[in-house]
Amino acid sequence: MSSTRSRVSEPLPTDTVGLVTRILEGYATNGVFRGFSVIAQTKATAKYRIVWHERTCELLFSVSRRTLRFGTILSDSSGIKEISNFVELLHSSERPPHRRIDPARARLRCFYRGGNIFFTITVIRNDFEYATRKLIHAANEILIDAEPKWK
Protein backbone atom coordinates (compact mmCIF):
# COMPACT_ATOMS: atom_id res chain seq x y z
CA MET A 1 0.00 0.00 0.00
CA SER A 2 1.39 3.41 -0.91
CA SER A 3 2.01 6.06 1.72
CA THR A 4 -0.62 8.28 0.08
CA ARG A 5 -3.23 5.58 0.29
CA SER A 6 -2.43 4.78 3.94
CA ARG A 7 -2.46 8.48 4.84
CA VAL A 8 -5.96 8.89 3.48
CA SER A 9 -7.34 5.82 5.23
CA GLU A 10 -5.94 6.64 8.66
CA PRO A 11 -8.40 8.46 10.91
CA LEU A 12 -7.38 11.95 11.94
CA PRO A 13 -6.51 12.60 15.56
CA THR A 14 -9.18 14.49 17.47
CA ASP A 15 -8.65 18.23 17.93
CA THR A 16 -5.75 18.39 15.49
CA VAL A 17 -6.05 22.17 15.16
CA GLY A 18 -5.95 22.48 18.94
CA LEU A 19 -2.81 20.35 19.07
CA VAL A 20 -0.98 22.52 16.52
CA THR A 21 -2.18 25.71 18.23
CA ARG A 22 -0.90 24.50 21.61
CA ILE A 23 2.51 23.64 20.12
CA LEU A 24 2.83 27.10 18.57
CA GLU A 25 1.64 28.77 21.78
CA GLY A 26 4.38 26.84 23.59
CA TYR A 27 7.01 28.33 21.29
CA ALA A 28 5.58 31.80 21.99
CA THR A 29 5.49 31.22 25.75
CA ASN A 30 9.11 30.05 25.69
CA GLY A 31 10.20 33.19 23.84
CA VAL A 32 10.97 31.60 20.47
CA PHE A 33 8.42 33.93 18.84
CA ARG A 34 8.23 37.62 19.75
CA GLY A 35 4.54 37.59 18.97
CA PHE A 36 1.86 35.02 18.26
CA SER A 37 -1.86 35.20 17.56
CA VAL A 38 -4.57 33.03 16.11
CA ILE A 39 -6.18 34.99 13.27
CA ALA A 40 -8.86 32.42 12.41
CA GLN A 41 -9.58 28.89 13.52
CA THR A 42 -12.11 26.17 12.70
CA LYS A 43 -12.06 22.43 13.35
CA ALA A 44 -10.29 21.91 10.01
CA THR A 45 -8.12 25.00 9.45
CA ALA A 46 -6.22 27.68 11.28
CA LYS A 47 -4.40 30.84 10.36
CA TYR A 48 -1.74 32.20 12.70
CA ARG A 49 0.32 35.38 12.78
CA ILE A 50 3.85 34.97 14.11
CA VAL A 51 6.45 37.65 14.79
CA TRP A 52 9.82 35.99 14.53
CA HIS A 53 13.34 37.05 13.54
CA GLU A 54 12.21 40.63 12.88
CA ARG A 55 9.49 39.40 10.50
CA THR A 56 5.75 39.02 10.69
CA CYS A 57 4.64 35.89 8.90
CA GLU A 58 1.45 33.94 8.51
CA LEU A 59 1.22 30.22 9.02
CA LEU A 60 -1.72 28.40 7.46
CA PHE A 61 -2.77 24.96 8.67
CA SER A 62 -5.15 22.63 6.86
CA VAL A 63 -6.12 19.35 8.47
CA SER A 64 -7.68 17.92 5.29
CA ARG A 65 -4.63 18.78 3.17
CA ARG A 66 -2.34 17.76 6.01
CA THR A 67 -0.20 20.84 5.44
CA LEU A 68 1.31 23.73 7.33
CA ARG A 69 2.41 26.57 5.07
CA PHE A 70 4.44 29.60 5.99
CA GLY A 71 3.54 32.63 3.95
CA THR A 72 6.43 34.75 2.79
CA ILE A 73 9.44 33.97 4.95
CA LEU A 74 12.04 35.14 2.48
CA SER A 75 11.81 37.59 -0.36
CA ASP A 76 14.47 38.44 -2.91
CA SER A 77 14.65 35.11 -4.62
CA SER A 78 18.21 35.42 -5.87
CA GLY A 79 19.15 32.35 -3.84
CA ILE A 80 16.12 30.17 -4.63
CA LYS A 81 18.26 27.35 -6.06
CA GLU A 82 20.48 27.27 -2.98
CA ILE A 83 17.47 27.42 -0.67
CA SER A 84 15.78 24.55 -2.53
CA ASN A 85 18.95 22.49 -2.24
CA PHE A 86 19.21 23.30 1.46
CA VAL A 87 15.58 22.23 2.03
CA GLU A 88 16.34 18.92 0.30
CA LEU A 89 19.40 18.47 2.53
CA LEU A 90 17.15 18.75 5.58
CA HIS A 91 15.79 15.30 4.63
CA SER A 92 19.23 13.74 4.18
CA SER A 93 20.22 10.70 6.21
CA GLU A 94 23.64 12.38 6.46
CA ARG A 95 22.20 14.84 9.00
CA PRO A 96 21.94 13.88 12.67
CA PRO A 97 18.44 12.52 13.43
CA HIS A 98 17.54 15.47 15.68
CA ARG A 99 18.32 17.93 12.85
CA ARG A 100 16.79 15.93 10.04
CA ILE A 101 13.24 15.71 8.71
CA ASP A 102 12.33 12.05 8.39
CA PRO A 103 10.68 11.72 4.95
CA ALA A 104 8.54 8.87 6.29
CA ARG A 105 6.95 11.34 8.75
CA ALA A 106 6.89 14.71 6.96
CA ARG A 107 7.98 16.38 3.73
CA LEU A 108 9.20 20.00 3.56
CA ARG A 109 9.16 21.90 0.28
CA CYS A 110 9.80 25.47 -0.75
CA PHE A 111 7.96 27.35 -3.46
CA TYR A 112 8.69 30.56 -5.29
CA ARG A 113 5.82 32.85 -6.29
CA GLY A 114 5.73 36.55 -7.02
CA GLY A 115 9.24 37.20 -5.77
CA ASN A 116 8.61 35.46 -2.44
CA ILE A 117 9.61 32.10 -1.01
CA PHE A 118 7.06 29.98 0.86
CA PHE A 119 7.63 26.82 2.89
CA THR A 120 5.10 23.99 3.19
CA ILE A 121 5.39 20.84 5.23
CA THR A 122 3.13 17.90 4.47
CA VAL A 123 2.20 15.63 7.36
CA ILE A 124 2.56 11.90 6.79
CA ARG A 125 0.82 9.27 8.92
CA ASN A 126 -0.99 11.92 10.96
CA ASP A 127 2.14 12.90 12.88
CA PHE A 128 1.04 16.54 13.18
CA GLU A 129 3.17 17.26 16.24
CA TYR A 130 6.34 16.03 14.54
CA ALA A 131 5.64 18.01 11.35
CA THR A 132 4.80 21.20 13.25
CA ARG A 133 7.97 21.07 15.31
CA LYS A 134 10.14 20.18 12.30
CA LEU A 135 8.69 23.08 10.30
CA ILE A 136 9.55 25.53 13.09
CA HIS A 137 13.05 24.06 13.52
CA ALA A 138 13.71 24.11 9.75
CA ALA A 139 12.45 27.68 9.37
CA ASN A 140 14.58 28.74 12.33
CA GLU A 141 17.65 27.14 10.78
CA ILE A 142 16.92 28.79 7.44
CA LEU A 143 16.36 32.22 8.99
CA ILE A 144 19.28 32.19 11.43
CA ASP A 145 21.98 30.15 9.74
CA ALA A 146 21.29 30.24 6.06
CA GLU A 147 19.55 33.47 5.11
CA PRO A 148 22.66 35.71 5.19
CA LYS A 149 24.16 33.45 2.51
CA TRP A 150 21.26 34.28 0.19
CA LYS A 151 21.12 38.05 0.64
Predicted regions and their residues:
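A short acidic/glycine-rich loop-to-helix N-cap element
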Residues: 125-137
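Charge-rich, low-complexity N-terminal segments
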Residues: 1-65, 102
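A generic structural signal for beta-strand entry/edge sites
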Residues: 45-47, 65-69, 114-118
